Amino acid sequence: MQKKVIAAIIGTSAISAVAATQANAATTHTVKPGESVWAISNKYGISIAKLKSLNNLTSNLIFPNQVLKVSGSSNSTSNSSRPSTNSGGGSYYTVQAGDSLSLIASKYGTTYQNIMRLNGLNNFFIYPGQKLKVSGTASSSNSTSNSSRPSTNSSGGSYYTVQAGDSLSLIASKYGTTYQNIMRLNGLNNFFIYPGQKLKVTGNASTNSGSTTTTNRGYNTPVFNHQNLYTWGQCTYHVFNRRAEIGKGISTYWWNANNWDNAAAADGYTIDNRPTVGSIAQTDVGYYGHVMFVERVNNDGSILVSEMNYSAAPGILTYRTVPAYQVNNYRYIH
């Protein structure tokens, strides 16, 4: 009888050890389309705060194919901030959550324009896990021949696979269409796209597009082609760059955020209290006021905005959802 008890204990211990080993093996998780930090933290039995701490996340924004730590200790910045080198010459940096081109450039004593040139970037969009060249000579353009040729399928229409550095406006210009049309064809209600995503660029819109968000169609929207002279890392700096990314550049002479509504109106922009994707949310609250870029308008009336110098230090890009009951506290520059 005693032998049986001992055997049972040994067997149970072995099973527990295997289970513990399996649990410990799950130290990382690759983000799948549609997943959220809440779903991932719930899956691994950790808090959202713990998940964000492990991965140095400054917001709840995550991307498909992003690899997240789900156990262990938080990543130290010593390795991530040290560029790697390769035999082809030059140094590389792996983008971390919360990075921006300007922030990376300041780390390595260069300019964001130089990083864009080294990597063949034509917009400011970068994503966690992306490897950027930070020194050396620019890579020869080698990936546009196939990636820029849309594929077709039997159901009609052509498709394009998103490459690193792409934006909706850039893709639209490649195929002689508008970013609004690409959003309509794919049922998009915000400007978020990611490498590897397949977008329809010609044909008819899908019947199940379900998007209730409209872009700023019908608004008077002048377009400027100015250099960004706003102070680096401020809310005005970010919104200027974000509008340039979508092909709706604004003036670099609107000064502080609390002057943007009046200055925009003087330049001929439509100003109202109705947010649309791509519009600028503006408030006079605070000494200098504040501006944000509207990334998405949700079905419940809330809006997702991107901003700088609000809940984090200057130069750190953050995202937050403005509740529906607060949306009317802002004016929207279209």
Curated annotation (Swiss-Prot):
Residues 71-86 have a biased composition (Low complexity). Residues 210-334 form the Peptidase C51 domain. Its EC number is 3.5.1.28. CDD domains: LysM. InterPro entries: CHAP_dom, LysM_dom, LysM_dom_sf, Papain-like_cys_pep_sf. SUPFAM superfamilies: Cysteine proteinases, LysM domain. Transmembrane segments: none annotated. Coiled coil: none annotated. It is found in: Secreted; Cell surface. Gene3D superfamilies: endopeptidase domain like (from Nostoc punctiforme) (3.90.1720.10), LysM domain (3.10.350.10). GO terms for cellular component: cell surface; extracellular region. Pfam families: CHAP (PF05257), LysM (PF01476). GO terms for biological process: cell wall organization; defense response to bacterium; division septum assembly; killing of cells of another organism. GO terms for molecular function: lytic endotransglycosylase activity; N-acetylmuramoyl-L-alanine amidase activity. It catalyses: Hydrolyzes the link between N-acetylmuramoyl residues and L-amino acid residues in certain cell-wall glycopeptides. It is an enzyme of class 3 (hydrolase). Keywords: Antimicrobial, Bacteriolytic enzyme, Cell cycle, Cell division, Cell wall biogenesis/degradation, Hydrolase, Repeat, Secreted, Septation, Signal, Virulence. Residues 71-90, 137-156 are annotated as: Disordered. The keyword Transferase does not apply. Residues 27-70, 91-134, 158-201 form the LysM domain. Residues 1-25 form the signal peptide. The keyword GTP-binding does not apply. Peptidoglycan hydrolase involved in the splitting of the septum during cell division. This is N-acetylmuramoyl-L-alanine amidase sle1. It comes from Staphylococcus aureus (strain MRSA252). The lineage of its organism: Bacteria, Bacillati, Bacillota, Bacilli, Bacillales.
